[in-house]
Amino acid sequence: DNAIRKVSAEPIVAGAEVEVIDGRGKFLMPGLIDAHWHAYLAANTMVDLLTAHASYTQLRAGEEAGKTLLRGFTTIRDAGGPVFGLKRAIDEGTLPGPRIYPSGAIISETGGHADFRMVYDIPEPFDCCGLTHTEKIGAAIIADGVDAVIVASRNNLRLGASQIKLM
């Protein structure tokens, strides 16, 4: 299960279940933790995040997760974005990647840092359908006022967020 069971300067008796790696002249370190990572921003351009099909950006994020693991990061805190499916795929062993602590959709007020609406998007009260592309894929949520932020936070927690990202 890719776990180091014992490190010793003394000889270890190798049995059928033991693999001994000669580490002389090498370094051993624990897995790194990245406390501010975005699977989607690391893997995709902003244009793709705003316009590409969700399946394309999902695949790119999965590839980036594998690369992140190979760079030595065994745990990451995703600071916002649609990673619940990616987390599940990694947890189940479908894809290689680090342990993910997800935030879910970034919560922002109208005109805030995570208001990724295009200039031609109609504000929600006047729009028949309500959700923008980034809201539909779970990248960001526009929440104006305390009640809306509470609802958005609860929705992220319901999906499995371990923390909430407000911008």
Protein language model regions, located:
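Fold-independent oxyanion-binding glycine-rich loops
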Residues: G23-R24, A79, S103-A105
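Histidine-rich, glycine-flanked metal-binding segment
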Residues: D1-M29
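Short beta-strand and adjacent tight-turn residues that come in two discontinuous sequence segments
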Residues: S8-A9, D78, L166
